[in-house]
Swiss-Prot record:
Catalytic activity, reaction form: tRNA(Asn) + L-asparagine + ATP = L-asparaginyl-tRNA(Asn) + AMP + diphosphate + H(+)
PANTHER family attached to this UniProt entry: ASPARAGINE--TRNA LIGASE, MITOCHONDRIAL-RELATED, ASPARTYL/LYSYL-TRNA SYNTHETASE
GO CC, one annotated term: cytoplasm
Subunit and partners: Homodimer.
Stated family: Belongs to the class-II aminoacyl-tRNA synthetase family.
Protein name: Asparagine--tRNA ligase
HAMAP family per UniProt: Asn_tRNA_synth (MF_00534)
Subcellular location, principal: cytoplasm
Enzyme class (EC, first level): ligase
Any one Gene Ontology molecular-function term assigned to this protein's record: ATP binding
Domain of life of the native organism: Bacteria
Record EC number: 6.1.1.22
Gene Ontology biological-process entries: asparaginyl-tRNA aminoacylation
Length: 466
């Protein structure tokens, strides 16, 4: 028996008059007075379902085929023929229908064939991939992740698997999930009455990582061009459409590099992956342009075909202070820009992605390289129209004395960064990198407004279902 996916049949990879079996889930079933049934079957391989024309002559027609409802899983064997209907190139003339699984109560099936709100779908995260929108999001998510790996491979980067469990805080913000096997009802204490983490599994405090950057820097300082792509965690009590407690980060690191080098890398990567998703997922992108954001395709094309605008933080502050827009958050040199400021710059002032550079040192992380003016650091953010910050990066502080000064200023425990300081003691080298929040990238490409709808099982404050 020859099996085929829906996408292979619809794109002509299966020859006309060939008999194949397609397996998937029933979207709809319609019975005609002529004694045939039309079943729309999807398997997730593409946006469209395939139509199977099922004749009443099949032995299980009355007792099974006519009882099929949305969500039932089946295998339909049939002959591939040119479709007689509109909107589809090929269909199946069924010769056999095998039912794998029934929907026990069709009246209470959560994914009934109608339009559901995104909030409703979140309650059924285990079933929402069967909907048009979540299926399309996940195919685009896959295309983007594959394109990212392909881009870095073609550029000569090595993928490094950085640890999820860590003992250091990359961002220095303290918003970390603790990893512990201590008995919460019988916590060991030190002589000072503090928690005795020497009794814990790792013999010290351990956390879920907020970033793989510090670890991947170690490998950049030996292998030159590396990146990590994996899950990260923030115990930040932000219940917004832009925040997740568990999300994926893309973090390249490049030795012998400046801020401008990684700014160019970020631009090249975004153009590469946007071009890839437009070429590989035209069906899904057409859906997003029609139903979610009419600019979904055109704005990606604009990014692919135009240069990013480079702008200094100081210049951006002057632009924001002198514009006629009333912002909720006041603008002064030294403040961290809010989403409303970033989006104004990218959407209204420039109308294109911006690489914003050279931020005040006091609002940035300890590891960012201090500029000669002593007030700013060689940091950058990539601001995209429609979402704001999508990438953050910097040149790293390779001078041990200045790095130590920053660690002390931020009251960070220097002993926890011993391995990081060693990189500056043994053959230090200028290097730079950036971090891309992968879910924000997926949200930007698809036009989906809430970041919880672009990851399979979202984790957020008071929300860890499934």
């Amino acid at each position: 028996m020859s099996y085929a996916s829906v996408v292979d049949v619809l794109t002509g990879k299966v020859a006309v008059d060939e008999t194949v079996t397609v397996r998937g889930w029933v979207r709809t079933r319609r019975d005609s007075k002529a004694g045939i049934s039309f079943i729309n079957l999807h398997d997730g391989s593409c946006f469209d379902a395939i139509q199977a024309v099922v004749p009443a002559e099949l032995p299980n027609y009355s007792n099974e085929v006519q009882k099929l409802t949305t969500g039932c899983s089946v295998a339909i064997t049939g002959v591939v023929v040119p479709s007689q209907g509109k909107g589809q190139s090929f269909e199946l003339q069924a010769t056999k229908v095998h039912v794998y699984g029934w929907v026990e109560d069709p009246d209470t099936y959560p994914m009934a064939p109608k339009r559901h709100s995104m909030e409703y779908l979140r309650e059924y995260a285990h079933l929402r991939p069967r909907t048009n929108i979540t299926g399309a999001v996940m195919r685009v998510r896959n295309a983007l992740s594959q394109a990212i790996h392909r881009f870095f491979h073609e550029e000569g980067y090595l993928w490094v698997s950085t640890p999820i469990i860590t003992t250091s805080d990359c961002e220095g913000a303290g918003e970390m999930f603790r990893v512990s096997t201590l008995d919460m009802l019988n916590i060991p204490k030190t002589d000072k009455g503090e928690v005795d983490y020497s009794e814990d599994f790792f013999g010290k405090e351990a956390f879920l990582t907020v970033s793989g950057q510090l670890n991947v820097e170690s490998y950049a300082c030996s292998l030159s061009k590396v990146y990590t792509f994996g899950p990260t965690f923030r115990a930040e009590n932000s219940n917004t459409s832009r925040h997740l407690s568990e999300f994926w980060m893309v973090e390249p690191e490049l030795a012998f590099a400046t801020l401008d080098d990684v700014a160019g890398l970020a631009e090249a990567m975004l153009k590469y992956v946007f071009k890839a998703v437009l070429e590989e997922r035209p069906d899904d992108m057409a859906f997003f342009a029609e139903r979610i954001n009419s600019d979904a395709i055109s704005r990606l094309e604009a990014i692919v075909n135009n240069d990013f605008v480079h702008m200094d933080y100081t210049d951006a502050i002057e632009i924001l202070k002198n514009c006629d827009r009333k912002f909720e958050y006041a603008v002064e040199w030294g403040v961290d820009l809010q989403s409303e400021h970033e989006r104004y710059l990218a959407e209204e002032h420039v109308g294109a992605p911006i690489i914003l550079k050279n931020y005040p040192r006091d609002i940035k992380a300890f590891y960012m390289r201090q500029n000669e003016d002593g007030k700013t650091v060689a940091a950058m953010d990539v601001l995209a129209p429609g979402i704001g910050e999508i990438i953050g990066g910097s040149a790293r502080e390779e001078r041990l004395d200045i790095l130590d000064q920053r660690i002390d200023e931020m009251n960070l425990p220097k002993e926890e960064y011993g391995f990081y300081r060693d990189l500056r003691r043994y053959g230090t080298v200028p290097h730079a990198g950036f971090g891309l929040g992968f879910e924000r990238l997926v949200a930007y490409v698809t036009g989906v407004q809430n970041i919880r709808d672009v990851i399979p099982f979202p984790r957020a404050p008071k929300s860890a279902e499934f």
